[in-house]
Structures are given as structure tokens and as C-alpha cells.
């Protein structure tokens, strides 16, 4: 490799290091709703802590470019570089602070457990603590957020993979609420 090529590579790397914002700065906007460590302070806002980095990275990119619906579509800066998006996703994935316990309805949890086993467990195993097929982790996610998102999937406002359409097919609003109660009632991590 020539000296000129090495100099260009070094210069590009140095510039990237010099201009990449620290993750704490990048997450300041996120923290207003998702909390400093990704534990949301608002019922209809998802927890980000402990979520899969790849899932978060893809979601951030989709919200920023407008291909994923969001209640606050302009909250992710379009100027973030790929490295900055990865840094934010990695930051929240590594944040393992506990999510607060939620009030759930026992009858709804029982109803949701039945549907979870039939329709959700293949992609969200271990009661939503694990993932297959690029699915997000669901255990201990905000109840109101999950209820809102299931309605968005059913109405077509939000799209995921075809598997979600199959999973929701034929379920009533009460069944979907039951699944949300089931996931919300779970511990995020096994003890």
C-alpha cells in the first residue's frame, strides 16, 4: 500500500474519531422520553434498555428515513452517521437497568399466555426474553406501548415481517390486549 493511500486512510479514520459525537450527547434527545438508560418514563414510549442492538439499529434507521411510523418522526436526527446510529443502539442494548414492575390484569395475562404459546413463542421465545427471526425482545415492555403497537400492526399503520400478519390474524382486540398484558407481566431477565 502506498504512503499516500495510508495517509488518506489515517486521515479518514482520524476525522471520524474527531467528529463522531459521544454517545452521551447523541442520546440526550432520546432520554427525554426513553430515560437516560433506556428505561422509559412514559407509558406509551418503549423501553430501549437491554433490547437487541441489531433491532435498535434497524429501527433507528427506519424511523429516521420515514419507513417506520413514529409518533415523533423527527426526533432522530437524519444527520447521524452509521457509526453514531450503531453507538446509540449498542449503548441501549448494553444498558441493563431494571424496568419498573407494571400493573397487569391477571385474567388478561392468562388469556395472553394462551395466545403467546400459540402465536408468539416461535419468534419471541422464553416469554419474550429471547429472539428469533429478527424479532424484538418483548418481556417487561411497556403495556400501553404494546397495546398501541399491536393496534398499529392490525390497522396496517405499522408493518413488520409477514409473520406478524399471520400472528395477529383472527385475534380480537381483547386477545391482543391479553398478549400485551402477558409480555408486560414478565421479568425482563430471569433471576
Annotated model-derived regions:
Residues 48, 86-104, 121, 125-141:
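His/Cys-centered metal/cofactor-coordination and adjacent catalytic loops
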Residues 38-69, 74-77, 113, 125, ...:
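Gly/Gly-Pro-rich "capping" loops immediately C-terminal to redox-active cysteine motifs
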Residues 26-29, 37, 44, 52, ...:
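Short pre-active-site segment immediately N-terminal to redox-active cysteine/selenocysteine motifs
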Amino acid at each position: 500500500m502506498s504512503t499516500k493511500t495510508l495517509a488518506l486512510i489515517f486521515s479518514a479514520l482520524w476525522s471520524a474519531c474527531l467528529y463522531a459525537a459521544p454517545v452521551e450527547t447523541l442520546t440526550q434527545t432520546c432520554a427525554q422520553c426513553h430515560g437516560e438508560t433506556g428505561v422509559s418514563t412514559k407509558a406509551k414510549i418503549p423501553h430501549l434498555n437491554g433490547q437487541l442492538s441489531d433491532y435498535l439499529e434497524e429501527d433507528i434507521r427506519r424511523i429516521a428515513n420515514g419507513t417506520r411510523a413514529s409518533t415523533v418522526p423527527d426526533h432522530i436526527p437524519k444527520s447521524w452517521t452509521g457509526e453514531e446510529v450503531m453507538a446509540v443502539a449498542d449503548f441501549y442494548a448494553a444498558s441493563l437497568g431494571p424496568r419498573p414492575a407494571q400493573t397487569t390484569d391477571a385474567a388478561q395475562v392468562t388469556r395472553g399466555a394462551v395466545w403467546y404459546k400459540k402465536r408468539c413463542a416461535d419468534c419471541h421465545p422464553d416469554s419474550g426474553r429471547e429472539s428469533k427471526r429478527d424479532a424484538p425482545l418483548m418481556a417487561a415492555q411497556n403495556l400501553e406501548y404494546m397495546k398501541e403497537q399491536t393496534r398499529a400492526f392490525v390497522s396496517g399503520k405499522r408493518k413488520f415481517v409477514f409473520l406478524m400478519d399471520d400472528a395477529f390474524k383472527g385475534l380480537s382486540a381483547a386477545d391482543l390486549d391479553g398478549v400485551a398484558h402477558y409480555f408486560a407481566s414478565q421479568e425482563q431477565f430471569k433471576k
